[in-house]
Amino acid sequence: MTQATWYFDVISPFAYMQASRLAELPDTVELACRPLLFAGLLGHWGQLGPAEIAPKKTFTFQHSIWRARRMGLDFNLPPNHPFNPIRALRLCVALDDLAAIQSVFRAIWVDGHVPDNDAGWAGIQAAAGIDDGDARVADPAVKQALIANGEAATAAGVFGVPTFVIDGEIFWGDDAFDMVLDYLADPAMMATDAMKGAATLVPSSERKR
């Protein structure tokens, strides 16, 4: 079996889209779904999120609307974004079940339930088929697991969501899912001189910071 780790944050519309394709993974893959806080990745790498740059935020959501339509996915923007995803992420940790995680994604990106207000949180719990979400997300072990997921991700070089890590290789973004499938069919594709050269490309100029 090939071990694949999928890092995601429910705050990302593209993670929702990639979640819809996970059934396309071959049966030889053992998938570990790892929720993490995208904001933690941004802080670690010193980046701004796409929603923190006004014109980028607009295009990101226009692109997500277009992409979902192209994929034939139900998709609606939530009433607020960015929102605080912590409760939903901890719930995904606690549930530890792909179908339940997908129900959380749909609650946010189809039904418009955001986890940082009580009505939205109730809607997310209902979508997941539970009514004890507060107790589940308050579990110290769940809280620590979410933190550990973020630490493992940054240690692996993950810088965005959604991201697959397979055999130490990073595949970032919903639009890299076909690359994931190609790699699983032919792992040698990442061992070519061209692919290996991407890691050693030297800059001739750097911007001032």
Task: Locate each region found by the language model.
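Structural alpha/beta surface segment adjacent to cysteine/selenocysteine redox centers
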Residues: 10, 14-111, 194-209
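C-terminal cap of thioredoxin/glutaredoxin-like
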Residues: 3, 11, 17-29, 103-209
